Regions:
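Residues that scaffold, gate, or flank divalent-cation-dependent active/transport sites
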Residues: 1-139
Length: 142
């Protein structure tokens, strides 16, 4: 049987997880995912590199790994937030736990991505759907 493997990746994981934490702590705050924003570097001194950016920041040409000072030249209104490694660790664990609900075969590739063997899950759902659409498989085969 051919295996069905999904590659699952969280888009802009550090920024997304920082945004969710910020909204939980202050529901009236602006969602970082909707404005030009980035995670990385030292927010106070504006040194270091961008480790994640929002889609609106990407539209300004900001790239992961570029110096914060260069990103700020491209987008002076860029909102910078500091890295929060504890939040990322907890979010990564929660992400992996969700994937494990769908398959017992999950291979974590990084903090925000994994390979998930969905072969049995997909086969079981297809059988269930076949039964629902066509009746019992043996009865339908007669």
């Amino acid at each position: 049987m051919e295996r069905i493997i999904f590659h699952v990746d969280v888009n802009s994981a550090f920024l997304s997880w920082s945004a969710v934490k910020r909204l939980r702590e202050d529901p009236s705050s602006v969602d970082l995912r909707t404005i030009p924003s980035a995670v990385g570097g030292d927010v106070e001194t504006r040194h270091g590199i961008i480790t994640a950016k929002s889609i609106p920041a990407k539209r300004f040409g900001i790239t992961t790994g570029e110096p914060v000072v260069k990103a700020l030249q491209k987008c002076p209104g860029l909102v910078l937030v500091s890295s929060d490694w504890e939040t990322y660790r907890q979010s990564s664990q929660a992400f992996m736990a969700i994937l494990c609900e769908y398959s017992g075969m999950v291979e974590q590739a990084s903090v925000d991505e994994a390979y998930v063997d969905m072969t049995e899950t997909v086969d079981a759902r297809l059988l269930k759907n076949c039964s629902r659409l066509q009746g019992e498989p043996l009865r339908a085969a007669r």
